[in-house]
């Protein structure tokens, strides 16, 4: 829509960079010298994804569109779901992209016993999700899509997370204090609940935060 396009254009000049790590930025530019021909665009308002991109030491622009459709076919399971959604998010931006732009879209889900735990609907939804995760192992899948006006490629990352048994008081405290309604599975592994509740992790910690940054770095080096 024209309204969405206007929002996209207004965001075009807003560069984001970790200013405190200037020397690190210079080194990263050398290692990712192949990216000079691209303007990186992160299509996400997630504070975690912004933090991870800044930690990578690259300059990027944040651009978002309202109400991007994140539905997916019911036949998809596991890692195929966020990969499909990440590509669908990219397709929503594609008509507005210019040559030389490299769009990064991502989607993360929590996969528990064959079911998706997305973002909870309200406080009680968050409490119910944490009760379901308590004392069990689950998977976190992230799909990432890289898109230009000429090509598109996507990949996935998976992490296994084992939660200790959470008391009702711990669940209630976390939900009230941290308001995790914007997080898949109703928890942030980097927050208090991760300190006291996560017993073990197999795979990328940063994938659980929402962006498998090491894998993304590897893919960017290949361009």
What is each of the regions a protein language model found here?
Residues 1-8:
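Short, small-residue-biased leader/transition segments that mark boundaries at the very start
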Residues 32-41, 76-223:
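Anionic-ligand binding patches
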Residues 32-58:
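N-terminal beta1-alpha1 ligand-phosphate binding loop
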Residues 60-71:
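A short beta-strand-loop structural module common to alpha/beta enzyme folds
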